[in-house]
């Protein structure tokens, strides 16, 4: 179980309200990281981008899904590979984050990998 939570306040949220929410969460024993209210926040945008790049490598025949995950687990000491992470947080969530990032920033780097699109539309995970 995590003891850290991220909190992003919308523009219409007062500083007093945000501080009160942080105080409540801290009283419940959670450590709070205050983040800017931007698309994807910090963790999901990073996980989504890693998963998207790994999915593109699989789609282009560079490696298998298992090999991509093993490379990241063993090569950079991630607790899970990016595709396993995508499956555990929900491939539909990854798809949605990438689409929102693409709409918000208009940059091609947020283009959803065809493999992720195929699997989401088929209702299937990347592994399995």
Predicted regions and their residues:
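NAD(P)-dependent Rossmann-like dehydrogenase/reductase catalytic/cofactor-binding core
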Residues: 1-128
